[in-house]
Amino acid sequence: VGTRNDKNDFYAALKNFLDEISSCDVLVVLIGRPWEQIEIPCQTITMMSYSTQEISETLSVSNAESVNIFSLTAGIAELLSTYDTSISFEENVKVALHINLPFYRLMSNKMCKCFRTPESYNTLLYAMANGSNRISELAMFSGYPKNKCDKYIKTMCEFGLVRKELERNGHTKYYPANSYIALWYKTLLTAVPNADGTYSEDVYERFMRSFNDEILSAFYKEMCAYWLDKNITSISTEYIDTKDLSYRSVKVGDVIFDFAYEKKRAVYAYYDTTLGGKLTQKLWKEIESSTTKNRPFYENEYIICTVNRVPDSFWTLSKHYDNVHIVALKSLFATYNKEDNRRMQPRFVPSFV
C-alpha cells in the first residue's frame, strides 16, 4: 500500500468492510513491507531473522559455528531449515550450491516476484557486492544515469535488499542488505552451473574465499567493535564515542588501525578477524613504531582483538604491560552474548523471511 496513490481509498474501503462485518468473527491479515501507521485498530507482527544466539540454541551448535551459519544464511528461516548439523559447515555449503535448492532459488525467485525487470536490479546489486558502492560508481558500472540508479536503489531499500551507510565525509555508500544477498551476487549470479545443477570446485573455492575474507571477517569486526564499545570505560578515563566514524580505519604510520583515538591518552585498536591469519612480532613492532613517534609508549592503550590463536609472545606483552590488552575469541563471544544483539545484525523484510 505504502506508495499507492489510492491508499486513502483503500483504507476507507477496508474500514467500511470491517464495519459491515463487525458482528462476524473475521480476521483480516495484511502482509507486506513495513506498514505506515493507520487509523484502523490493528496488531503489528514483525518477522525477523534469527540471531547468532538463537541459531546456537536452536541447532545446538557452538558459538563459532553459529556465526558461520548466520553469515551464510543471514538468519533466514527458510535457509536455516536446510542446514544439516550432522555434517560439517563446508559440506553444508557444497550441498547448498545447487540451482534447484533454496540457497540459490530464494534470491532468484524473490527478484522475479518483486520486479518486472530483475536484470536491471541484479546489475546494481552485483556492482555493490563487487565494490562499486557510490552512486557515481554504480552509474559508471551499469551505464545507467545517476537519477535512474537512485530510483532503483530507493526501491531496493524499500524491499530490504539494500542498506546505506553514511561515510565520515558525508557521502553515502550502498551495500547488499545482508550477508546472504552479498554472497549470492558476489559468487553465484555470474557463475555457470554444471549440467546437473551443481557448481564446480572452482566456484566453491571462490565462494569460500569471499565468505571467509569478506563476510565472516566483517561480522567478527562488528563483534570486536561491540567489545570495544562495552569495555572502553574500563580502559580509558576519557569519554570516547566509539561510534564516531572519524576514529574508524585510521592509518597511523604504516599501520591501519580499526579504531584510533589520539588525544590526551591515545587508544589504538587492531582487529585480527580473518580466520587462518595470525599475529606476528613483525606486526607488533610496526604497531609500536607507528604509535610512539609523537608520544611515549606509556601514554598509549593498545587493544588487540583476534579470532585466531593468540601467540605466546602477545600474552607475554599483556602480562608485562598494563596498557596492552589482548582480547581472544572466547572473550569476544562472552561480551557479545551477554544480551540480544539483533540491532547489530541485518534485518530482512517480512516477505523475504
Task: Spell out what each predicted region is.
Residues 30-36, 49, 76, 305-309, ...:
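A short beta-strand-to-loop transition that corresponds to the Sensor-1 phosphate-sensing loop
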Residues 54-57, 162, 334-341:
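Short, charged, surface-exposed secondary-structure boundary motifs
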